[in-house]
Regions:
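Glycine-enriched alpha-helix->loop->beta-strand junction motifs that scaffold or abut catalytic
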Residues: 77-80, 106-110, 140, 161-169, ...
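Active-site beta->alpha loop and helix N-cap motifs at the rims of alpha/beta catalytic domains
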Residues: 35-125, 146
Length: 272
């Protein structure tokens, strides 16, 4: 599998995301409960191990006690997957992200980025000082790669024009409005083709490496279509993050690696 240079980190072209591990199914309560029941601590560790065996060397996952515990145990048991830490706020604790950044660096994160809902909310609220503070804090902790996720093209345009980051993590879809709250909304999510096209247009204008995510609309859109769009959009030093629910298919990791190699490994496009 191809590799990309993200800041000072070398990252596999396909990476694994943590939403299924934490029950963020984007497919309703029954599906969420199914993921939570399947992904015990041991099953998550086995999935990370299988990812490494398939050539995936990086995990994009939350900063919370659950994931901290799993990663600590996984690394203590000999695992070596890199972790790009997703920095979140909490309900009633809008400033706690600073603690999670520090905790992630202390635990051993390779990279860190602000959660897409937080980024959407900060940008919509005009809280641009938070972006500058986040960059300064992450840089001070000597993380190898720092960036921001987001579902809104205009937020990514502002980041592109105003911040020095190592990557921008661009969601192909914008399932819910985060202008009033940064937190996850499980009901009424929307997966519109026009949102995907707007983000693809934005991606083409970004010169730093892009992490393409939600390419399958949280499992709500066809897999091959997602990989075809990715293959057309991905630039030479871009990567992709995909959450995988092995409860559906124990071979999902190797199948996704094969599809990524088929559609993306031959891509040698210069940055726009």
């Amino acid at each position: 599998m191809r590799k990309a240079q993200i800041g000072n980190a070398t990252v596999s072209g396909l990476t694994i995301g943590g939403n299924p591990f934490s029950g963020f199914s984007h497919q309703g309560k029954e599906r969420t409960d199914e993921m939570l029941a399947f992904y015990t601590d041991d099953q998550i560790k086995a999935t990370l191990r299988a990812s490494e065996e398939a050539g995936i060397d990086t995990f994009f996952g939350r900063t919370d006690d659950h994931i901290f515990r799993i990663l600590r145990g996984y690394w203590d048991g000999g695992g070596s997957i890199q972790w790009f830490a997703q920095i979140c706020t909490e309900r009633g604790k809008p400033d706690v992200w600073r603690d999670w950044v520090k905790g992630a660096a202390e635990l051993g994160a390779t990279g860190a980025y602000l959660h897409g809902g937080v980024v959407d909310n900060w940008h919509a609220s005009g809280e641009h000082d938070n972006f500058h503070e986040a960059v300064a804090l992450m840089r001070s902790l000597e993380l190898k790669a720092i960036g921001f996720a987001g579902h809104k093209p205009d937020a990514h345009g502002w980041i592109r024009d105003n911040l020095e980051v190592d990557f921008q993590m661009c969601s192909y879809y914008n399932p819910s409005d985060r202008s009033k709250s940064a937190h996850h909304v499980s009901e009424g999510e929307k997966w519109h083709e026009e949102d995907r096209q707007l983000m693809l247009d934005m991606i083409s204008s970004i010169t730093t490496p892009v992490v393409h995510y939600k390419i399958f609309a949280g499992g709500n859109r066809p897999i091959i279509d997602g990989f075809e769009k990715l293959g057309n959009a991905i630039k030479e030093n871009d990567i992709c993050c995909v959450g995988m629910f092995l409860g559906d298919d124990p071979e999902m990791i190797t199948k996704n690696v094969s599809l990524f190699e088929q559609y993306c490994d031959t891509v040698e496009k210069p940055v726009a």
